[in-house]
Amino acid sequence: MSKKPGGRRMGQNRMLRLLDALERDSRADAVIDALTRGVRALPLGRARDALHGRWLGHPVHPLMVQVPIGSWMSAAVLDLRPGRSREAGLLVGVGLAAAGPAALAGAVDWAELHSEQRRVGLAHAVANAAAVALYGASLVCRVTGRAGAGRATGLLGLTAVGLGGMLGGHMAYRQASGANHAEEVPHVVGAGWHRIGAVEEFPAGRPVRRTVDDVPVLVVREPDGSFHALAERCSHLAGPLSEGSVADGCVRCPWHGSVFRLSDGWNVRGPATAPQPAFDTRVVDGYVEVSLRRQGPTTPGPAGHEAAEAATGTERGGDHGHSA
């Protein structure tokens, strides 16, 4: 029996086509927008940055989900062994207890994504909520002596976890949610100094966009005549920092409100978890030149962090990619 040319390849891409269709499906956008507003309104304070993973340098949600997933997977293995139902039930309970904090971390990240990412993210959350419900039912069955039903609902829960993980992987690796969108800058910008314009082209205190080796660069001139330069596309989701606001030595992304220190690109406030690549600057014969700084930024002390927050405000940025 012959196969159509490319038939196997088409079959392999069916799931991808379904996921691409999910990204474009706007029917749940009203629900998504309402949930987004609710998550943004949570009074989390500085805990919001901790949940984003700013302290870790990348999103903390993937780290936190290891506890519930690992617990539930281990419970499934123990369910295959006679006489281990008590230990399996304990692991189901541990997974349920850890699911809440992991979900909260995922929610604060999700609320600051583009519309297409949030659509897939809603399906990811629904699958995980189904898993929690099934494991909750599994725990009840186990406690009430219905071990067989507990094992069965646990396996259904593990299936839902797998579906949620697949959707989460699509968000992370195909849609690049949570990725550092400025990571390629050191690999694209050539070494040495690059002339970007005459001094008079840069008004004091106003962000200006220039390009170096096809990489957009944010340039800010201080009132004293000194210059700062950072990669212009925000590390969070590539927002245009040149359209953001500048205050007290920091620039605020206009899309989701991430704040970066102009002197070295340090991410003072999230949702960005990675700093901006920074450039050294100099003036030669009336022209501004920049050179990519190869060493990373230094973390600010508490006083510097508080000053930057006071200068840039505590609200998130605009609703780029959102209809909320």
Regions found by a protein language model. Name each.
Residues 1-324:
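Short amphipathic, positively biased membrane-proximal segments
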